[in-house]
Amino acid sequence: MKWLAIILVVALLALQYRLWMGEGSIASVVSLNREIAKQKEENARLRERNRLLAAEVDALKQGKDAIEERARNDMGMIKEGETFFMIVDETDKDTKKNKK
């Protein structure tokens, strides 16, 4: 009976070690669940970015309005006969003077 108790205690310790420290342990499962959650967030962010880029590509394929808007905003282009006015904020001037 004494040997049976010792064997059972050793088996219990071996199983507990595997549960807490071994492969597939509670700690590794928790860590994997965290990684899965992070990856799901990243996938959702990238999916939204892809959706926006696809919408932009479709808009550029559809007509001149999107191309014109892009040229105006990104490249600073203006139409023939238009006048471009740049409004400078006074606080920007003061900030630049104080840095010198």
From Swiss-Prot:
InterPro entries: Cell_div_FtsB, FtsL/DivIC. It comes from the Bacteria. Residues 1-3 are cytoplasmic. The chain crosses the membrane at residues 4-21. It is found in: Cell inner membrane. Keywords: Cell cycle, Cell division, Cell inner membrane, Cell membrane, Coiled coil, Membrane, Transmembrane, Transmembrane helix. One of its GO terms (biological process) is FtsZ-dependent cytokinesis. GO terms for cellular component: cell division site; cell septum; plasma membrane. It is a single-pass type II membrane protein. Residues 22-100 are periplasmic. Its main location: membrane. Residues 26-73 form a coiled coil. It holds the Pfam family DivIC. Part of a complex composed of FtsB, FtsL and FtsQ. Essential cell division protein. May link together the upstream cell division proteins, which are predominantly cytoplasmic, with the downstream cell division proteins, which are predominantly periplasmic. Belongs to the FtsB family. HAMAP family: FtsB. This is Cell division protein FtsB. It comes from Saccharophagus degradans (strain 2-40 / ATCC 43961 / DSM 17024).
